[in-house]
Amino acid sequence: MSKMTNDLEKIRGGVHIAVQGYEVDRITEVPIMRRAEKVYLICKPGNNDSKRGKAFKNVIIKKFEEKRVNYEIVEADLFDLDDIVKKMKLIIAHERKEFGDVKFYINVSSGSTIGCIAGITCAMILNKENSRIIPYYVMPEKSLDGLSEKEKEELKKEYESKYNCPYLPRSFGVRGVKLIYPFEVTLPREELLIFLKFIGRAGNRGLTIKELSILTKEEFLNVDLNDNESIKELIKAVERKESVSNSSVKKMKNLVRELKEVVGSDVDDLKKIITWRKKCRSSVSSTGQSDLVWVNKNVVEKLLELELIEKPEKIGKSKYIRISEKGKMLLNYVG
């Protein structure tokens, strides 16, 4: 018991994330007692929620408002692991972007097993040295099944009069808290994940090694589809040619249009892989071949070794790189 109490005392402030279940105290009491900076409650959309679920959500909100706890409701499909993980990722990314080194506490006892798995998974994959993600499990003082009929009647009257709630949660009070420290997953370097994301966006077609090498060119970053001269500069950088034909410009323009769709709004990510290539290029003689060799060795072979892409398929003179199911799964958590 003392160990549980110590774990409770280890929680200080921070941003709390909880998936709603048929619980109240298990969600509200720890953030209230340990002065949470903010609580994100992940719950079903109102039109899909049950009467019981809506009632408990209202009780939770009322308790937070009574204690002046800053909270935000985030809607998700609570039967969909991927959707819960996605919402947790968005919460974590938003808080880190706005406030920097935020400490997160994820309540893995408040909802279903799916919510628990989502919380543990996010802690394993998204942890940072200066922005920790720590799951915790709340031990209740009493469970609904362990109460006498008299106790149930008294609590029911309290919930109806105080919260206008005709239902009772599955447990009451907090007996202790256990922090859970999951092992951390070592992820590939950030630039590899960016390449993987772009490969994934290319769908079933995938991207060729040459197309991946084009993404590492600063000329691609600066290219303007309405400016043929910038297209020519890109062709010269990629193919090491001094003179460029009109047919080459037309062909490259179509390719650039496709690659820009792959990159989308992730220009900052594009800059990161360009910078990575620049650093490597500074120590290696730059030729048209060395770019292709570099991409093959440092990107394709590494992703293949991690089983994040399928074995490259040669069609004609080009090798096509496609994302694997494992790669898709990883991007779902970190992309």
From Swiss-Prot:
It comes from the Archaea. This is Uncharacterized protein MJ1513. It comes from Methanocaldococcus jannaschii (strain ATCC 43067 / DSM 2661 / JAL-1 / JCM 10045 / NBRC 100440).
